[in-house]
């Protein structure tokens, strides 16, 4: 059974389309109008082996906030849709990714219980034209719409680009670990309760 999500979200501020395949090969087409966000979406796809097709048109003439957030919402919804009842997955994932002097650790649980614990200390306010406070806003949107429990910890780093890119790489590898099928589970739901919540899977 294909583990795919297909979301089209339209508001007065943005028009976002996301297609996602958890069992992909890392193919990515991302056009959001926010170049640094596109670069980070490529990290999720490439290192998570998730096929992503994302197109967004938003009010970037004002700023990148609405587009950044709505892309995160749509990615979270597509992820929830692709996971369904989360039957047969490993559920938990953890990875620490270095990028030169930066080291970021991510742990996550596909629990259906949205929570973000975030401790990046990004020195600069901007990376190119991208406002670095939008990194957290992206993950807030993903978490709230996918039902992930997500912990992000910066262990080292002084270069803003390196810190953020290491974060996205660690997230992608932890997500891949958590969402891959566990052959020992034989299709069972990975919970002692026998059920996991399906936040965002509308």
Curated annotation (Swiss-Prot):
Catalyzed chemical reaction(s): D-erythro-1-(imidazol-4-yl)glycerol 3-phosphate = 3-(imidazol-4-yl)-2-oxopropyl phosphate + H2O
InterPro entries, per database record: IGPD_sf (IPR038494), ImidazoleglycerolP_deHydtase (IPR000807), ImidazoleglycerP_deHydtase_CS (IPR020565), Ribosomal_Su5_D2-typ_SF (IPR020568)
UniProt keyword Amino-acid biosynthesis present: yes
Enzyme class: lyase
One Pfam family named in its UniProt record: IGPD
Listed pathway(s): Amino-acid biosynthesis; L-histidine biosynthesis; L-histidine from 5-phospho-alpha-D-ribose 1-diphosphate: step 6/9
Keyword list, A-Z: Amino-acid biosynthesis, Cytoplasm, Histidine biosynthesis, Lyase
GO BP, sorted A to Z: L-histidine biosynthetic process
GO molecular function, one term: imidazoleglycerol-phosphate dehydratase activity
GO cellular component terms, A-Z: cytoplasm
Gene3D superfamilies associated with the record: Imidazole glycerol phosphate dehydratase, domain 1 (3.30.230.40)
Chief location bin: cytoplasm
EC number, UniProt record: 4.2.1.19
Classification via PANTHER family: IMIDAZOLEGLYCEROL-PHOSPHATE DEHYDRATASE (PTHR23133:SF2), IMIDAZOLEGLYCEROL-PHOSPHATE DEHYDRATASE HIS7 (PTHR23133)
Family: Belongs to the imidazoleglycerol-phosphate dehydratase family.
Name by which UniProt lists this protein: Imidazoleglycerol-phosphate dehydratase
């Amino acid at each position: 059974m294909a583990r795919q999500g297909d979301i089209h979200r339209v508001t007065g501020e943005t028009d976002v389309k996301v297609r996602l395949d958890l069992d992909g090969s890392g193919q990515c087409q991302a056009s959001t109008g926010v170049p640094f966000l596109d670069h980070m979406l490529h990290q999720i796809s490439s290192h998570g082996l998730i096929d992503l097709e994302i197109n967004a048109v938003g009010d970037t003439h004002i700023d990148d906030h609405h587009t950044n957030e709505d892309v995160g919402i749509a990615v979270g919804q597509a992820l929830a849709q692709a996971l369904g009842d989360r039957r047969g997955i490993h559920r938990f994932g953890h990875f620490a990714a270095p990028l030169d002097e930066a080291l970021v650790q991510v742990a996550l649980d596909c629990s259906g219980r949205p929570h973000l614990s975030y401790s990046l200390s990004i020195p600069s306010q901007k990376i190119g034209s991208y406002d670095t406070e939008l990194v957290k806003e992206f993950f807030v949107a993903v978490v709230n719409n996918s039902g992930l429990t997500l912990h992000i910890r910066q262990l080292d780093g002084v270069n803003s680009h390196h810190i953020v890119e290491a974060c996205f790489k660690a997230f992608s590898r932890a997500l891949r670990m958590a969402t891959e099928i566990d052959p020992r589970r034989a299709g069972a739901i990975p919970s002692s309760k026998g059920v996991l919540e399906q936040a965002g899977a509308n």
